[in-house]
Structures are given as structure tokens and as C-alpha cells.
Amino acid sequence: VARGSERSQKCAEHYGVPLYESVSQVPSDIDIACVAIRTGALGGNGTEISIEFLKKGISVILEQPVHHKEIAECFKFARSNNCCFMTGDLYLNMPEIRRMLSVTDYLRNKGVKLEYIRAGSSVQAFYPFVDILNRLVRGGNVNLEYVSPQRGSFKEAIGDISGTPFSFEFNNDMNPHDPDNHMHILHTFTLYYE
């Protein structure tokens, strides 16, 4: 589904797929829709488009970030229309992230203790950052000891997750006219072991 621009027409032609200009044109026998359009959290209509698909009984993967109220609304429509909803998981499938998580699992299984985490991310990619972090430490309670005031584009946080100390650098700045760009940092992780 696209607005029918020259770019979307060329894309559909290149991949040999039909181009629909509204969700209502999409046949009901489609299994899943991947919605890579900004959600309401970023001023877009990706959530509304997702809900239109869900109302048709078509499962949806929606690109992050998504506000928690929008997620709840999408789950409600998925449940009532007997289909599935999830947010995208792009970063967890990147080779570098998979390799890091694999090494972390290997060390954990060998009994090597994770001593400290130094990490950073941006507001645009914070949801997947938290997901990756959760997989590094296998969940747990977060204890924030200190959150700095905003310094330029960044904030810092210090604390621990179930006893594993951390320091996070967070790029807390987004250009409202171009929210997909201008990140100073995407994801960075430095893990210290015994």
C-alpha cells in the first residue's frame, strides 16, 4: 500500500507486486501486512493503517516506535478479528546483534559473570534497545540510581539490572521534521566480564 507516487510505482514494478493505494483495495486473503510507516508517536498514520488491516483480519507487523496506548489498541483489534499483531524486531535480526547475543549466551552458559554494561541508544531506537538489553541480562528489576539532566542532545543514566551495574548514554533529541535521521547514536554495547 502506497500513495501511488512514481517511486512506489517503480518499486512495485521492480518487485513484480501489485500496488494498492488504500487498505480497502487489498484482498482479504493476504496473510500479513508489514507496516513501515511512522506511527502516531512520530506524527504518522502507521497505527491507523495497521488497525485497518487488523479490522480486515490481516495480521500486522508494525515498525517501532509505537506508543503503548497504540499497541494496546492494535492488540484489541487483532484479538477481536482473530489475527495477530506485533511490533517489528529488525535490530534483533541484525548479524552484529545476533552475534553479540550468541557470545553473551555462550559466556553465561560457561558461568562467566557479566560485571558491567556500558550502552547507548537514541530515542528513535529505544524500544529495540530495551529488548536487546533484556536479552543480555535475561530480564530483571531495573534500579535507577541517577539520571542526568539533559546535556546537549544526551542524557545519562546509572543503575543496575538485577544487580548488574550499568551506565547508559541516551540520545534524547529528535528532529520533528525528519525523525528517521539525525541520530548521533543507534545502539552501542560494551560488556565487561569477570
Q: Which residues make up each language-model segment?
A:
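Short loop/edge segments at beta-strand edges and connector loops
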Residues: 21, 62, 87-89, 146-148
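Beta-loop-alpha module in the N-terminal Rossmann-like domain of NAD(P)-dependent dehydrogenases
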Residues: 15-77
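NAD(P)-binding Rossmann-fold cofactor-contacting core
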Residues: 1-12
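Contiguous beta-strand/loop segments that form the cofactor/metal-binding neighborhood of enzyme cores
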Residues: 124-194
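Short glycine-rich anion-binding loops that position phosphate/pyrophosphate groups of nucleotides
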Residues: 38-41, 90-91, 173
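Short loop/turn motifs at secondary-structure junctions
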Residues: 29, 56, 108-113, 140-143
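Short, flexible/disordered intra-domain loops and linkers
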Residues: 1, 39-48, 176-183
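A contiguous active-site-proximal alpha/beta segment in oxidoreductase catalytic domains
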Residues: 67-132
